[in-house]
Amino acid sequence: MNKSIVFSGAQPTGKLTIGNYIGSIRHWVEMQKHYQCIYCIVDLHSITVRNNLCSLHTRSLDTLALYLACGINPDISTIFIQSHVPEHSQLNWILNCYTYYGELNRMVQFKEKSSRYKNNINVGLFNYPILMASDILLYQTDFVPVGEDQRQHVELVRDIARRFNNIFGTVFKIPNVLISMYGSRIMSLLNPTRKMSKSDPDPNSYITLLDNVDCISKKIQGAVTDSDSPAAICFDPIKKPGISNLLAILSGISGQSILNLEESFQSKTYAQLKDVVIQELSCMLKDLQCRYISERSNEGKLNHILNVGSQKARMQAQITFKKVNELMGFYKES
């Protein structure tokens, strides 16, 4: 029996946080056992923000090496670079013509990013969700694992797919959202009401997968907690966002449930909680970093994985895009 298809992607920053790992990548690893997984390094999405384009190639390989170090297996999952499959961009233009301005204008993430990047509010940033729709719909995706902050984008993808299907018949599968109960949204260490982000101007607000032990210790020790006495270690994101964030991090890396952690820290201090988080994080990341160094040093292997992945992805993408092209009535090359 054919497995359901999961599609997910991340930008090639070359720098993933523990938020990326706990909220996304550890779930990607587990999903490989149950789904046909397609994981895309979305380099086209990444140019909506002004980064150093000269390093995009290097960052793409860094990101792949991190995926492998985390446990993504190219023998059972398809891993590829978005720009290597031109059907993404081609379908993007077609779906542009079946998406309304008002729909994009309601996207919360566009409003947040345009306020953050006031000198670069480009059309690509505005159209970002349509390219995301192309990414997902090309592969007849069943499930899209996303954080709560991306749910609105996937709902738009579903709306676009339904609209296209209503006009042309069933072309696209309507994807569903997969959201984990805990760990989908790891928050900033310094402002636990905001999502942890590697683009945060203060590096003490996040921990990357390549941070060393001293760096991890410093950042966790400086993480926001509470001033109540005696300490009350419980999961309550509204009343105790800092403590809840540390519990979510510890749960994500240790595999223990939030409930079990609450019980084990019932009579402990905030300092003791931080010490355990530091110990668990340092141990996990030390092993991961050793695997990363090994993978990143073999550039030939990385290139081979991407070449094979792109070929597999394009074969699937072309099936969908050919059907779309025929329905649109485009003149065929003779």
Swiss-Prot record:
The keyword Signal does not apply. It is an enzyme of class 6 (ligase). It catalyses: tRNA(Trp) + L-tryptophan + ATP = L-tryptophyl-tRNA(Trp) + AMP + diphosphate + H(+). Keywords: Aminoacyl-tRNA synthetase, ATP-binding, Cytoplasm, Ligase, Nucleotide-binding, Protein biosynthesis. CDD domains: TrpRS_core. Coiled coil: none annotated. This is Tryptophan--tRNA ligase. It comes from Blochmanniella floridana.
